[in-house]
From Swiss-Prot:
Belongs to the glycosyl hydrolase 30 family. Keywords: Hydrolase, Lipid metabolism, Signal, Sphingolipid metabolism. It catalyses: a beta-D-glucosylceramide + H2O = an N-acyl-sphingoid base + D-glucose; a beta-D-glucosyl-(1<->1')-N-acylsphing-4-enine + H2O = an N-acylsphing-4-enine + D-glucose; an N-acyl-1-beta-D-glucosyl-15-methylhexadecasphing-4-enine + H2O = an N-acyl-15-methylhexadecasphing-4-enine + D-glucose. Pfam families: Glyco_hydro_30, Glyco_hydro_30C. The keyword Calcium does not apply. Pathway: Lipid metabolism; sphingolipid metabolism. The active site is at E259, E364. Residues 1-21 form the signal peptide. PANTHER family: GLUCOSYLCERAMIDASE, LYSOSOMAL ACID GLUCOSYLCERAMIDASE. InterPro entries: GH30_C, Glyco_hydro_30, Glyco_hydro_30_TIM-barrel, Glycoside_hydrolase_SF. It comes from Caenorhabditis elegans. GO terms for cellular component: membrane. This is Putative glucosylceramidase 3. Gene3D superfamilies: Glycosidases (3.20.20.80).
């Protein structure tokens, strides 16, 4: 380990010892190109996020995370009208709260089988630490949760809720142990921690194999062209919501199919099913939509179409929303982050212009799915990638952002198809501890400070292309701006709220994320 890494680690450890102990990261370093730091949670300690508290007139609260080891570090700063003599800013960020856009739904992650498997492997104390870290008032305050309908790649095997061939009446429908022992206990703890303030949405990876032309959930292929199959699959959705309701779990929404474009690949390595925009439209308007609307339990569910990369927009949305029958049953578009490097964000703007009454919502993202598969412990670049994508999405009308697995093991699994990836929390069940990756703190800069119901406002950046930002107004007069700097040098930055006259100057250290919160002047 290089000398400067040792020095920084010693400083971090010293800060941990003398600071507000419950709020400080318990650091562990890994070898890497830079300082790779995770925060360790064990039976005796898990870090928390210091509350915002009261915001005095003329002051701002700033939270910082950085390559050098800050993890949502709280600071209080005074408003600054003038610079010192010979002082000039590198970047100016201007917020105009009079120009408003979409409301924020929220942020969260997925209750996969794999996440549940890791969760239940830990002691009750550590389980509570994970729930507190994600859903608690001193944690990220997640308010969104995704639940796979039956199995996906982050399961230990293929299964559906009814694998009895041609059981069109679904007499054999039943929740297996994966739901009863892995997903549901985790979800119920999150519901309790949030006092019910969590919106769950469900997504299937495939219909039961016997409903597909291939006879198997794994690999591509569409549903059998049989009205009995279409109706049985619509009934299958309802039975899922009914079964979870019997465990006191209700849902806010659903997507019709996870990544339907992958279903065109007959050799796809895990569960999927093919739809085109046209076949999704027809299944929705003829079968699924009517089934959901005719039942009180499901009549208000938010139905999202696509659930795939934004490169399929706006065409996919146009096909479904321009149909006068299908559009009655569809509320929004679900998008994944995969392929965003090759699909411009302006596609989101076009979709919003075409369909201003429908929302756009981010339903899946993860690091480690290409290049280096699986976790890279303490990797800051992946935290930057998360922050960069969330800022871009929010600035292009997306209403929220859902991470993939809430936690995984040290290999990035378990995953029956060996499609291992990274996660904000990595579990070491042998040592009975878990590690918060930099991605965890990057997510917190948004989920904790951009609450449900806040509204995105106009943000302009001048001075450096390595800086990006997004801003919201919050009920009660607060404003918040999240700033990502990917610059390798420090940048003196002024934030100006043109509607209130508020101005603050802060230094952005190299490779850092900041959330700045202030109050509207009376």
């Amino acid at each position: 380990m290089s000398r400067w890494k040792v020095v920084i680690l010693c400083l971090l450890s010293f800060m941990f010892e003398i600071g507000h102990a419950s709020f400080q990261c318990n650091p562990k370093t890994y070898d890497g190109a830079f300082l790779n730091i995770v925060c360790v949670c064990n039976a005796t300690f898990c870090d928390e996020i210091e509350p915002i508290g009261e915001i005095a007139e003329g002051k701002a609260i700033v939270y910082r995370s950085s390559l050098d080891g800050d993890r949502l570090k709280r600071m209080s700063m005074k408003m600054k009208e003038k610079l010192r003599k010979n002082e000039s800013v590198n970047v100016t960020i201007t917020i105009d709260a009079s120009e408003r856009f979409q409301n924020i739904f929220g942020f969260g992650g997925a209750f996969t089988d794999s996440a549940g498997d890791q969760f239940v492997s830990l002691s009750e104390t550590l389980q509570n630490y994970i729930v507190d870290s994600y859903f608690g008032k001193n944690g990220l305050e997640y308010n969104i949760g995704r639940v796979p309908i039956a199995s996906c790649d982050f399961s230990t095997h293929e299964y559906s809720y009814d694998d009895v061939h041609d059981d069109f009446e679904l007499k054999h429908f039943a929740l297996p142990d994966e739901d009863l022992k892995l997903k549901i206990p985790f979800i119920k703890k999150a519901i309790e921690k949030t006092e019910g303030n969590i919106q769950l949405f469900a997504s299937p990876w495939s219909a039961p194999g016997w409903m597909k032309v291939t006879g198997r959930m794994r690999g591509g292929g569409a549903m059998r062209n049989d009205k009995r199959v279409y109706q049985a699959y619509a009934d299958y959705f309802f039975k899922f919501f009914e079964a979870y309701s019997s465990h006191a779990i209700t849902f806010w929404g659903l997507t019709i199919q996870n990544e339907p474009s992958t279903g065109a690949d007959m050799a796809w390595r895990w569960q999927t099913m093919n739809y085109t925009a046209e076949t999704m439209r027809d299944f929705l308007k003829k079968y699924l939509g009517p089934k959901l609307k005719e039942n009180k339990l499901t009549e208000t569910l938010k139905v999202m179409v696509l659930d795939d990369g934004r490169g399929l927009l706006p065409g996919w949305a146009d096909t479904i929303f321009n149909d006068p029958e299908a559009t009655k049953y569809a509320d929004g578009v679900a998008v994944h982050w995969y392929g965003n490097l090759y699909s411009p964000a302006v596609l989101l703007d076009i979709t919003q212009r075409h369909h201003p009454t429908k929302f756009i919502f981010g339903t899946e993202a993860c690091a480690g799915y290409f290049g280096h598969h699986g976790p890279i412990m303490g990797d800051w670049f992946r935290a930057e990638s998360y922050a960069d994508d969330i800022i871009t999405d929010l600035n292009h009308h997306v209403t929220g952002w859902t991470d993939w697995n809430l936690c995984l093991d040290e290999t990035g699994g378990p995953n029956w198809a060996y499609n291992v990836v990274d996660s904000p929390i990595i579990v070491n069940r042998t040592a009975q501890e878990f590690y918060k990756q930099p991605m965890f703190y990057a997510l917190g800069h948004f989920s904790k400070f951009l609450p449900r119901g806040s509204t995105r406002v106009f943000t302009k950046i001048e001075g450096n292309l390595a800086v990006s930002a997004t801003s919201v107004v919050i009920e009660g007069g607060r404003r918040a701006t999240v700033i990502l700097s990917k610059a390798s040098n420090s940048l003196l930055t002024r934030i100006v709220d043109s509607s209130t006259g508020f101005s603050i100057v802060l230094n952005l250290p190299p490779r850092s994320i900041h959330t700045v919160i202030w109050k509207k002047r009376k």
